[in-house]
Regions:
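A conserved nucleotide-sugar
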Residues: 1-41, 154
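An anion/phosphate-binding loop that grips the pyrophosphate of nucleotide cofactors and donors
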Residues: 55
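Short hydrophobic beta-strand element within catalytic cores of glycosyltransferases
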Residues: 80-84
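Aromatic "clamp/platform" in nucleotide-sugar-dependent glycosyltransferases that forms part
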Residues: 44, 63
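Short glycine/serine-rich donor-binding loops of glycosyltransferases
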Residues: 68-73
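A short hydrophobic beta-strand element within the catalytic core of glycosyltransferases
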Residues: 58-59
Length: 154
């Protein structure tokens, strides 16, 4: 997908966060596609709120995510967010979220990314709080979730 976007907009840069099991495979693919100068492997960081300020569009074409906190955080920072339709609709709290099927041709994903050029960013923290994504509510949600997981392990 990034290769298609980059061919339309050569000044684009892809920031990849995390160090999961696909890290090496993705690095190899980036080299194979000759995109090393345009892809940055950021690893893991506890500075994501600062990182969101360097991003123009948050894209998560994921097969399986559960409730991705990163998608909620990206909205709070005012970013437009494009998510795979496999991701729970609970994440789409603000009007700056677009869901796309993974089966869609990458051309549709690229078109949607480009549609967000010139997007006016502003903090959406209040919208998220009204939707139940206050820090305390989210902490309580995850606490209950992990307590249930632990209970099921017994």
């Amino acid at each position: 997908m990034f290769s298609a976007l980059h061919s339309k907009c050569p000044d684009t840069v892809l920031l990849l966060f995390g160090d999961g099991e696909l890290y090496k495979k993705i690095q190899d693919k980036v080299k194979k596609m000759n995109l090393e100068d345009s892809v940055r492997f950021m690893g893991t960081t506890d500075e994501m709120p600062k990182m969101y300020q360097a991003i123009d569009v948050f894209v998560m074409p994921s097969f399986c995510e559960g409730l991705p906190v990163a998608g909620v955080e990206a909205q709070a920072s005012g970013l437009p967010v494009i998510l795979a339709d496999t991701i729970t609709k609970e994440v789409g709290v603000t009007n700056c979220v677009k869901y796309l099927p993974l089966s869609d041709d990458k051309v549709e994903w690229v078109r949607e990314i480009l549609n967000f050029r010139g997007f006016k960013r502003y903090s959406r923290c209040e919208e998220l709080k009204r939707a139940g994504f206050d820090e305390k509510d989210v902490a309580r949600y995850f606490q209950n979730y992990y307590l249930k997981v632990l209970e099921n392990l017994k």
